[in-house]
Structure formats: C-alpha cells, structure tokens
Amino acid sequence: MSNYKVTVLGAGLAGCEAALWLAGKGVQVELYEQKPAHFSPAHKSEGFAELICSNSLKAERLDSASGLLKEEMRRMGSQLLNAAEVARVAAGGALAVDRDTFSAEVTRMVEAEPNITVHRERVEHIDESAPILVATGPLTDGALADEIGRLTGDERLHFYDAVAPIVTAESLDYEKVFAASRYDRGEADYLNCPFNKAEYEAFHAALASAERAPLHEFDAGAEQGAQPDPDAHGKKADTVTVYEGCMPIEIMAARGADTMRFGPLRPVGLIDPRTGHRPWANVQLRAENKERTLYNIVGFQTNLKWGEQKRVFSMIPGLENAEFVRYGVMHRNTFLDAPRVLSAGLCLKEHPNVFFAGQITGFEGYMESAACGLLAARNIYARLEGKELPAPPIDTMCGALIQYLTTENRHFQPMGANMGILPPLPEDQRPRDKRLRYMAVAERAVASFQQWLEENNF
C-alpha cells in the first residue's frame, strides 16, 4: 500500500478500469458514482460499467481494429476484459457479453478491492489539489458539466454530437473522385465526387425515403436553438429536433430536390475532369487525419440507420465500394474539444491535476473508453511517481487514438478504433490482400506497444 490517493468520478467502463489498475498499484482510490441517487436518462441499473446500447464489445481477431485494441489492453492489464470473459455469450468472432452479468462482475471486482472506497453520491465540484480523474461519460450534465466548462472554457465543451460518416482513402474509386478546391483557390484540400443529373436524382430519392434510426428520449428532447423537424417520418414533431448548424442530410433532402444542390452538394467552382463541365451536384470529402488515410463526407451528419447509410451513401460516385470506418450519428454527447484542451497525458493543459478518460474525451466506443481509462491511470501513476509517461507510439492503436485526440482539428469529433488511423506500411512491405495487410499492421503495433510498455515499466 502506498500513500498515494486519487479521486475517480464515474464508475463506467473508463472509471472502473482506471480505479482497478490504480488500486492494483497500491493507490488509495476514492471512486464516486452518482447511481442510485441520480440516474441519467440512459442508465437503468445500479451496477457499474453498465452497457446502455449494444452488448457487443466487437471483434477479437488481431487483424481487426477492435481486436488489436483488446490485445493492447490485455498487455496493460485490463480487468474489464477479464470480466467480459466471465460474462461472455456466443457471438461468432466477436466478444459479446450478458450485460447484467458483465456489470455485476465489474461491480463485484470494484467492491472487493480493498484499495477502492466507493461513494454513491453525485459530485459537483472538481478539487484540483490532487490528481482527479473525470470519467463521467457522454451524458455528463448539471453542475459538473458547468464545472468542466469553467475549467476548459464553455466553448470547449460540446453537448451535441453530429457526426458525418468516415471512409478509408484506399477504398475510393479515383477514376471518379478528383482532388480540387473551388475555383482552384489554394491547395486541393478536398476530394470531390461529381454527380450527373440522373445519378443525383436517384441518390436524392433514395436518401429522402431512407429509414432513420429511432431517437432515444435523451436525444430527442428540445435544446435551446433547436427547431422541430416538420417531416419526422412518423415521429412527433415536438419530440424531434433539428439543429440548423448540423442538419441531418436526410432532412435536407426531404425539403426539396434542389436543397442539397444549393447546400453541401453545391457544384459551383468545380469542373469534373471526365467531362470538362461543372457537375450537376458534388459531394466533398475532407481529410480526417494528417496522413490522409481517412476522409469524412462533408455535410453528411445523419440519423439514418447504419445499413441505410451503407446502401444510400454507396450511391455517391466514387464511393460504390467505400469502406466505412465510422457511420454518422446524431445524439446527445458531452465531450471535450480535446485537441485544444487535453494533453497527450489525458490531463487538461491548463489544469494538469485534472485528468479525463472515456467517451467524454472523444474516445468513441466501449473498449475505447476502457482503454482510455487504462491510459489515464498509467499517466496519473507516473505523475504520482514524479515521472512523465510518453504517449504510446503512433503505430499502435492506443497511440493513434491519442494522436487523433491531441492533433489540431477544427472539425474535431469523437473517434473509435479503426485501421485507418494507423500509419500505412511502407510500399515495399504492403501485402495486396487487405486481411494480410491488416495483420502486418497489427503485428507491427503489438511489437511497438510491447516495447513501449517495457521502456515505461514503473
């Protein structure tokens, strides 16, 4: 047992993973959880690490992004992966769990740990006098959200997540897609997907009639500055909100055949090199990372079901065989403007004793949140020991996620594990087969991650 003491706010995936790791190092952890005194609109049980959406923790294969992330987590000593084994249910090549069993096992592990003291109460003030980890999740609200806003600047804390889909660069059809800026001004920073009239009309019809995902109650409530959607496909207009600054592309399509052509799909200032003429409409793709291995579909914030996104957005010229690494979502989501306020050590740049972990940082997904908890815990422990922990190498999944989180990005949005954020292999070492290529990338990542662990073993 050490004399170190750390406060952790939130007993979700990130908070529990961090608390268990720190406790294993002999740190006295004060873990605060607001349930059962206060429940968010999404949470129903009193247990820790409650899974509120899917019960899948995604693929286990090493040559998949989620499988690679799990391998890195195992090497860091993940306790939640042990709990997942206890709660495992059959799911083919994926790791899926009985959510009640999983939560019960994590709760048992936390409550059985002598170095963790659980406080079932809501915290509204952040005490910076000692290291504190905020892992309160994407539904953080009330006085604590105000406190975070005070520390980060209110404009650096987002309360609504409107995300466009992201595709891999290597899956695009460059016979159709071309690089250009409007009127050839400046660098050709965007890729362009030009429509002719027939292609656009077919795309518009498919988009306007596509099936939308149901909104959770906590996503659908009216927010300041929101307007009711008058065409909500059967949903009550007073329960569905449309944000003019991030309007779903399908609602724009429903407003008229030409609405998109005078909005995000406007073709002005562009020439299709195949025809020598201005396209009827044009979709732009913007690089999501410096390596330009990922592109987001500009202006395509959406609430379509994921299968519908794949079907409809694959009608965009050049995206017929696109690999989607993230589908668009629109939901209530409290997260930091991480590139501006968060260091690579997952603490605030201006308040270094205040650490963050989980989805509130911009790590998107169950296992990503847990991995973020492990990384934050290691950084906190290094700080207690008077050391600074370097971020994992960028050719590892954890390192690539940290780099994404902390690299300047005017359009920052949460990101989950995907192979597209990892640096590509050198051309002479790149297998043509995608499965073999991903395996080679994963093996490189594991070796690099293991070396990082050995060099920073404290």
Which role fits each region the language model picked out?
Residues 112-286, 291, 295-306, 310-311:
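Predominantly flavin-linked oxidoreductase catalytic cores and closely associated redox partners
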Residues 415-458:
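C-terminal auxiliary extensions adjacent to catalytic cores
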Residues 369-391:
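Internal hydrophobic alpha-helix adjacent to the cofactor/substrate pocket in enzyme cavities
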Residues 297-363, 370-372, 390-407, 412-418, ...:
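A glycine-rich dinucleotide-binding beta-alpha-beta segment and adjacent secondary-structure elements
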Residues 99-118:
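Helical element adjacent to the flavin cofactor pocket in flavoenzyme catalytic cores
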Residues 2-14:
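Beta1/beta-strand and adjacent pyrophosphate-binding region of the FAD-binding site
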Residues 50-60, 85-101, 105:
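Dinucleotide-binding Rossmann-like beta1-alpha1 core, especially the glycine-rich loop
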Residues 20-82, 394-402:
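N-terminal FAD cofactor-binding segment of flavoenzymes
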